[in-house]
Amino acid sequence: SGALMSRIIKLWLLLFFFVPAAALSYEFPPERSKSDAETEFGWMVLPLPIVVEGIGSGVPIAAAISNVYKSADLLMAKTFFEGDFEINLFSFSKFPLIGDKLLFSFGFTDLNMPFRSYDRGIDSGKDDYYQTLEKYDSNFVTFQSQFYKQRLEFLVSYSTGGTKLEKIFDVDGNDFSNIQSPQRRWIDRVIGTQIDLTDNHLDPNEGLRIGILHSESNYGLNELSDYAVNDLNVTAYFPFFETHTLLFNAFQSRSYITDNGIVDENALRNKYGLGCDLETETTACQNAETRRINYWLKRNQSSKATALGGLNRMRAYSLGRFYAANSSNYVLEYRLNYSEKRTPINWIFLGGIRTVLQTSFFYETGSVSDDIARLHEKMKSSFGVGFRAIISGLIYRFDLAKGEDGIAPTLFINYPLSLGTLGS
């Protein structure tokens, strides 16, 4: 299997360095285009049921309004019905401060819902996790500058957040509430740039797109390590027939510690223990406690690169499923645009100008490792089909992917394989 993986990696390298050069040499960069429908007013309002086994359920109502003011978009979500979770989300993005040269975004999130933390590394199993029920809040501001018909972009973002743990659940649904150090806060700083040498900023058919993102997380706590992450995202688009597109995507993420926290297990256990002596299920509590201590101990020792799994990459796996100090991901996706007719939509829950209906087929392979020399020794894969509609400049996406953990659906706004909010 090692020899086979070596051949696969060499094939990817050939594809990314030689095929794009040959295919794009005819007209590169391609002529830039933009549809008037991208600036039309549009909306979507839908309930999004959330069910987490062993913890509970909730039904937030999500609303997206595109081009509410010039290029600015509005995104909101809130739980109006009684349930086990609470979600309050507001985001106002791409407000033009100086024409289309300087865009401003801001938003806040206020949640009371569960988060799942898996064991570290590519070998973690689908049941190797603990879950936390948390009160979570965050705020962000972002400035984006775009030049040369959005071919060149710069981004600066600042966000603060905090969380308070109310309960911890093990994989069997046992819950423990005697949590030491339940609160933590952080500050994130992000800078990035993107070079977009494609024919269309919203829905590329040909060309090359390169994005770089640097982020720093500062916890302000002596017990937790601060760290930084560098991400590189490269996507090459090749036109097939009149409206189809074949894309290759390569993603690399590297992280490193900027300020050391506690790396002694006993000292960390004193800070993040669960008081298992006070629990009825003592053994189950101790297992969950050990899993939590190992999570933070290894994160303090080796930091955490951008994880694989969820909405953007390795779509067959849960959000944040695979993580370590380094991660990589490679994707082959074929997109069939079978309708590009400008079609007005005026439904109660969905409206705007539809310009594209699309079906996609994709294959992904990726890995994570604390040792960069072993990053590609063992890979996980994901494959599936997606359905997308572009309505008034927003991309509504439903993907269905299969991997070792089973089949997973994704319902989201925006294409996959993006790099933060670059290009959005």
What residue ranges belong to the model's regions?
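Transmembrane beta-strands of outer-membrane beta-barrel pores
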Residues: 51-53, 65-67, 79-85, 96, ...
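Outer-membrane beta-barrel "beta-signal"
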Residues: 191, 387-391, 407-424
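Outer-membrane beta-barrel translocator/channel fold
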Residues: 79-148, 175, 247-307, 400, ...
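Transmembrane beta-strands of outer-membrane beta-barrel proteins
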Residues: 43-45, 73-77, 102-106, 152-156, ...
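C-terminal outer-membrane beta-barrel translocator/porin domains of Gram-negative envelope proteins
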Residues: 202-352, 413
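Cleavable N-terminal export/targeting peptides
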Residues: 1-32, 422-424
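Transmembrane beta-strand segments of outer-membrane beta-barrel domains in Gram-negative
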Residues: 31, 114-259
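Outer-membrane beta-barrel initiation region
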Residues: 23-106, 155, 179-205, 305-315, ...
